[in-house]
Amino acid sequence: METDINRLKVVLAEKKRTNKWLCEQLNVNPSTVSKWCTNSSQPDLPTLVKISRLLEVNVDDLLNTKIVDF
């Protein structure tokens, strides 16, 4: 089973942005962004929307839609 819920780390790299940049934009602790990027925890929906706007992508682009658990 795929365990990565979000693709934040991948999208940040594609957009040539860093964790530090994102934490500064969102005014959150760097460890929070690090946890999101490693899928240790997940941003809430309003934060996910903010991230998508900052990175100029759809929210869907930040989510791993291939998670299947049958």
Q: Where are the regions that the model predicts?
A:
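Recognition helix of helix-turn-helix/homeodomain-like DNA-binding domains
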Residues: V28-Q42, T65-I67
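The alpha-helix within a helix-turn-helix
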Residues: L12, C23, S52
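Short, charged recognition helix plus adjacent turn
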Residues: E2, V10, K15-K16, K35, ...
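DNA major-groove recognition helix of helix-turn-helix/homeodomain DNA-binding modules
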Residues: P46-D61
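Short coil turns linking two alpha-helices in DNA-binding domains
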Residues: T18, N29-T32, D44, N58
